[in-house]
């Protein structure tokens, strides 16, 4: 009998779940990227202090060590490195026309290091390992937020503006809400991927969702519904077969089309129904003022991370026109326009589009193994970019995870290998299988054993 072979799924050189110490190190960097605890304690007025900058030095050293350790792995994401490198080059070049070149240069360096960590994260934490890491990290921060709310309410609960609303380990309730959305969506993805510890995922999903509600952030609530609905919908379609899949896709297209039509026809009524000010709490006034600043420098912007400085003249015009100390554009795309102009906005849009296309094309493979986390997070990220400044940031969790998705999407799984089983025994040492007709005198019979 010839050799037999069976196909075993194998990912040569890939790590499905890195060791505990590496998960702990990566989780610490993610914790720092959320701006939790240290920033509110060391800089309660939200200013950038020298002490706060020093806290990032261990993060940068840790990132360098992780990069060196996994260099052979992360270099496989070279298309993502090229795309991210182009964005970094554009941001660095903007220092030559920036209204605050020192800040631009310093933050480009910080963004380069954190971009490296993002690409490492996507290349090393494959399949469900990344949503599991995010779920565990956010679960720890959720417990920490509860401690702050009940033990140290002066930090964990808003005292002046938005008094009584929970903010946990962060400056603002929206920050807590968005981090908890990441935790909840990651927990849902772990459940959809068949995580080996479903109870941990269920606890994380429940606690993170509870904190989203406690933050009373409507943007976070919409993101939670979108992300968890994306994961749950695709999981149900995959389990339901072809008929349910086709029906679900058609239903999704009709629902999305209907929602878009209602929004364009009467967006004010939609916002009123959601309990939101039709002017988006004055944000439309901010956007109108900012677009006038964009018209003054449409091709260059005012320099990466330079527009919102305390001594910024164009930002002072915006604050004067809106009669409000505006901290940001509250829109990722407009914020990008005032920093890098239309070239920067188009470049970032192309990078995000590449990530979206790759994730959609790999939904049946990578998507199923990770519990559809990448697609769900991209949907949340795109929605979030319309109301928060989350694009091309030098140190933020949303942009880091977007780049991590790009990194994991450009690395294709290693081909399956065939592992040969043991060869059949030779004629000298083994007997081949026989059937009844092989015996000359008919089927072999055994005499019954007789007991005395």
Label the model's feature ranges.
Residues 2-69, 88-97, 381-383, 440, ...:
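N-terminal signal-anchor transmembrane segment
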Residues 55-59, 80-87, 101-123, 133-138, ...:
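Aromatic-anchored transmembrane helix interface
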Residues 60, 92, 116, 131-162, ...:
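Alpha-helical transmembrane segments of multi-pass inner-membrane proteins
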Residues 123, 200, 229, 241, ...:
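Hydrophobic transmembrane alpha-helices and their immediate junctions
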Residues 147-152, 214, 232-278, 291-296, ...:
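A membrane-periplasm/extracellular boundary helix in multi-pass inner-membrane enzymes
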Residues 209, 216-218, 321-359, 383:
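A conserved mid-to-late transmembrane alpha helix and its immediate loop/hinge
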Residues 271-288, 292, 296, 300-340, ...:
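Long extracytoplasmic/lumenal interhelical loops at the membrane interface
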Residues 374-438, 452:
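Transmembrane alpha-helices of multi-pass inner-membrane enzymes
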């Amino acid at each position: 009998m010839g050799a037999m072979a069976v196909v075993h799924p194998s990912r040569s050189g890939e790590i499905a779940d890195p060791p505990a110490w590496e998960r702990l190190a990566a989780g610490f960097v993610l914790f720092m990227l959320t701006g939790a605890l240290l920033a509110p304690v060391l800089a309660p007025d939200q200013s950038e202090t020298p002490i706060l900058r020093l806290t990032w030095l261990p993060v940068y050293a840790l990132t360098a060590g992780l990069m060196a350790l996994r260099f052979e792995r992360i270099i496989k994401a070279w298309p993502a490195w090229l795309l991210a490198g182009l964005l970094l080059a554009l941001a660095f070049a903007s220092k030559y026309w920036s209204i605050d070149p020192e800040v631009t240069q310093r933050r480009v360096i910080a963004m380069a290091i954190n971009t490296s960590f993002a690409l490492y994260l996507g290349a090393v934490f494959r399949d469900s390992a990344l949503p599991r890491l995010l779920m565990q990290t956010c679960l720890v921060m959720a417990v920490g937020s509860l401690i702050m709310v009940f033990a140290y309410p002066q930090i964990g609960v808003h005292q002046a503006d938005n008094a009584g609303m929970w903010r946990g380990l962060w400056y603002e309730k929206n920050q807590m809400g968005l981090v908890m959305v990441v935790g909840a969506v990651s927990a849902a993805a772990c459940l959809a991927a068949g995580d080996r510890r479903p109870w941990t995922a269920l606890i994380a999903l429940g606690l993170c969702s509870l904190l989203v509600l406690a933050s009373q952030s409507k943007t976070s609530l919409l993101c939670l519904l979108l992300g968890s609905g994306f994961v749950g919908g695709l999981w149900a379609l995959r389990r339901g077969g072809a008929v349910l899949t086709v029906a679900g896709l058609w239903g999704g297209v009709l629902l999305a089309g209907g929602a878009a039509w209602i929004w364009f026809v009467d967006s004010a009524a939609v916002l009123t129904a959601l309990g939101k000010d039709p002017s988006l709490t004055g944000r439309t006034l901010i956007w109108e003022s900012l677009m006038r600043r964009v018209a003054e420098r449409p091709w260059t912007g005012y320099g990466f991370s330079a527009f919102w400085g305390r001594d910024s003249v164009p930002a002072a015009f915006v604050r004067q026109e809106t009669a409000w100390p505006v901290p940001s554009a509250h829109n990722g795309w407009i914020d990008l326009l005032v920093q890098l102009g239309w070239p920067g906005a188009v470049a970032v849009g192309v990078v995000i589009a590449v990530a979206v296309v790759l994730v959609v094309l790999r939904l049946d493979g990578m998507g199923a193994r990770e519990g559809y986390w990448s697609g769900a997070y991209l949907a949340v990220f795109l929605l979030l970019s319309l109301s928060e400044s989350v694009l091309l940031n030098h140190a933020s969790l949303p942009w880091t995870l977007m780049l991590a998705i790009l990194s994991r999407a450009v690395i294709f799984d290693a081909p399956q290998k065939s592992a040969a089983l043991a060869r059949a025994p030779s004629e000298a040492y083994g007997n081949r299988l026989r059937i009844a007709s092989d015996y000359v005198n008919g089927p072999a019979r055994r005499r019954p054993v007789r007991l005395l």
